[in-house]
């Protein structure tokens, strides 16, 4: 449903007897092998075009100024075109907390190349099954995904994050990822950017799949 976000239905429980003082409130969190000042970050969205590069540079500027982690969209376009500069934000923002991502269909050597070229704090490996199915040029072979994931988890020189792209990650997938060596997952559920909607607007004809997947709240509850 356009405009719907599952977090709108979440109500916080009021507690009348606090156990800490206000100045003891601590927002720091730990994931992907390190501590972070905030429990949120600017997640992967775009890249691979002039407009995408403009958006990435603006987001990187904000992220650096605020001390927030910024993740670029899939680096796959730059792997095909070495002249692609839409992901090169560290040169302009040397203090930026930076990470990037590529698709799980990419073999380990391309993941290593991505790390060498971008020097991220971690690498997201994204799973986008429904998006691929809706893309006329999308992947149709998925048997190698789990093998790729196991290789990344074992050999990657930086922390690995297995990332959904807005369809939610179910408990079975999370459990299988753990068995393959993954220690950090991004369950990104329905309610934000919809790549099903984007692909259907781009020329697809399966609008009945625009709302496919679990919401982020459903995915969070399922992951407990």
Protein language model features and the residues they cover:
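Glycine-rich phosphate/ribose-binding loops and adjacent secondary-structure elements
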Residues: 143-146, 150-224
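Hydrophobic faces of well-ordered beta-strands that scaffold small-molecule active sites
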Residues: 40-43, 68-73, 96-102, 121, ...
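Acidic (Asp/Glu)-rich catalytic clusters
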Residues: 30-34, 58-65, 86-94, 112-120, ...
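Active-site cofactor/substrate anionic-group-binding motifs, chiefly glycine-
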Residues: 30-77
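An N-cap/entry alpha-helix motif that binds or orients negatively charged groups
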Residues: 1-32, 36
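Active-site mouth loops of central-metabolism enzymes
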Residues: 41-53, 99-109, 161-170
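Phosphate/diphosphate-binding glycine-rich loops and adjacent basic-rich segments that engage nucleotide
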Residues: 120, 125-152
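N-terminal active-site wall of soluble small-molecule enzyme domains
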Residues: 58, 81-90, 107, 148
């Amino acid at each position: 449903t356009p405009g719907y976000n599952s977090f709108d239905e979440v109500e916080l429980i009021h507690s009348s007897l606090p156990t800490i003082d206000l100045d003891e409130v601590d927002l720091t969190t730990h994931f992907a092998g390190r501590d972070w000042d905030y429990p949120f970050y600017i997640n992967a969205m775009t890249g691979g075009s002039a407009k995408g590069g403009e958006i990435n540079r603006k987001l990187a500027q904000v992220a650096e100024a605020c001390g927030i982690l910024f993740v670029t969209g899939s680096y796959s376009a730059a792997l095909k075109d070495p002249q692609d500069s839409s992901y090169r934000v560290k040169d302009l923002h040397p203090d930026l907390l930076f990470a990037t991502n590529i698709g799980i269909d990419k073999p380990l050597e391309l993941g290593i190349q991505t790390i060498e070229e971008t020097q991220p704090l971690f690498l997201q490996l994204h799973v986008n099954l429904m998006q691929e199915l809706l893309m006329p040029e999308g992947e149709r072979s998925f048997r190698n995904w789990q093998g790729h994931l196991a290789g990344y988890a074992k050999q990657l020189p930086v922390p690995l994050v297995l990332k959904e792209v807005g369809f939610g990650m179910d408990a079975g997938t999370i459990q299988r990822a753990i068995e393959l060596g993954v220690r950090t997952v991004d369950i990104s559920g329905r309610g934000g950017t919809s790549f099903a909607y984007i692909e259907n607007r781009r020329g697809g004809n399966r609008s009945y799949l625009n709302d496919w997947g679990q919401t982020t709240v459903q995915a969070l509850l399922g992951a407990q």
